[in-house]
């Protein structure tokens, strides 16, 4: 078996980018997801069937990557996700996700930039790269997207590949934010919607400019939030939750009580 990481090799097979790790996991995970969820999938026409692409989504639950990967895999793409490095050190799980070509992120460390290089490599190979721009589960008390990090923008502006916005809603009822217990007693409706590509071309010549990265990030997050508002049938908050102005930690777990205190501010 090649020692080259799966994300650094051209994608093959169908769904594009699949390999033995994806195929084994899909045989186990997909039947479980079908038993636990009722799927409402929309916007599948916006997902390219070939070529490099960045897909970006809101983040509310540890179940998010599984249900989103199911959508992508069932519609022709085996994604390479950026995920926190600690998961890659979990016995068995770490080997599986590494073998499937997922990319570790060393958050809040001097190795964080390594993920950018690996992700650009994956895109140069023609992969579908999945990103949660917020970098962690949203801190917004009502689960709206919060102010995101600029990693997605740096990747999008340097690679100039299409960026497809996604929103998902419902799997927080399957597994609540930072929850440990899955809801088994009823099937949970999970809605995932894709939108048209976000045009970031006005910032292509400013890929290393921080203001351009912030503006590009905001445009992608606006598209994601609009899709989520459509799903929820509600208006998004006028003021976007900014974790930098919060008492909640930027990454890592926090108590529901602390989140409720934020809501009362």
Label the predicted regions:
Residues 48-109:
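Catalytic core of membrane glycerolipid acyltransferases/transacylases, capturing the structured
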Residues 29, 99-106, 135-139:
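Short, basic, glycine/proline-bearing loop/turn elements
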Residues 2-43, 49, 91-100:
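A transmembrane-helix-recognition feature enriched in membrane-embedded lipid enzymes
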Residues 2-21, 113-265:
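Non-catalytic C-terminal accessory region of glycerolipid acyltransferases
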Residues 43, 58, 83-84, 101, ...:
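A secondary-structure boundary/capping signal
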Residues 27, 42, 67, 92, ...:
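Short Gly/charged-rich anion-binding patches and loops
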Residues 37, 86, 109-113, 145-146:
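A conditional alpha-helix N-cap/helix-loop micro-motif detector
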């Amino acid at each position: 078996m090649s020692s080259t990481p799966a994300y650094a090799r051209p994608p093959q097979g169908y769904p594009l980018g699949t390999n033995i790790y994806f195929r084994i996991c899909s045989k186990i995970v997909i039947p479980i997801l079908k038993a636990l969820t009722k799927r409402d999938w929309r916007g599948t026409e916006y997902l390219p069937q070939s070529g490099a692409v960045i897909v970006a989504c809101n983040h509310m639950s540890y179940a998010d990557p599984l249900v989103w990967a199911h959508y992508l895999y069932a519609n022709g793409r085996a994604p390479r996700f950026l995920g926190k490095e600690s998961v890659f050190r979990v016995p068995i799980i770490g080997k599986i996700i590494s073998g499937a070509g997922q990319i570790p992120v060393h958050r809040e460390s001097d190795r964080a930039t390594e993920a950018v290089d690996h992700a650009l490599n994956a895109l140069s190979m023609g992969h579908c790269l999945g990103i949660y721009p917020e970098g962690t589960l949203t801190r917004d008390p009502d689960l709206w997207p919060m102010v995101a990090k600029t990693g997605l923008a740096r990747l999008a502006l340097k690679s100039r590949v299409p960026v497809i916005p996604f929103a998902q809603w419902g799997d927080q009822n399957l597994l609540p934010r930072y929850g440990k217990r899955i809801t088994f007693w009823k099937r949970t409706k999970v809605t995932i919607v894709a939108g048209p590509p976000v045009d970031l071309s006005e910032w292509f010549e400013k890929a290393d400019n921080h203001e351009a990265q912030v503006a590009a990030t905001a445009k992608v997050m606006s598209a994601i939030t609009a899709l989520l508002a459509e799903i929820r049938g509600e208006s998004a908050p006028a003021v976007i939750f900014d974790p930098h102005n919060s008492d909640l930690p930027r990454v890592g777990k926090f108590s529901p009580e602390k989140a409720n205190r934020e809501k009362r501010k």
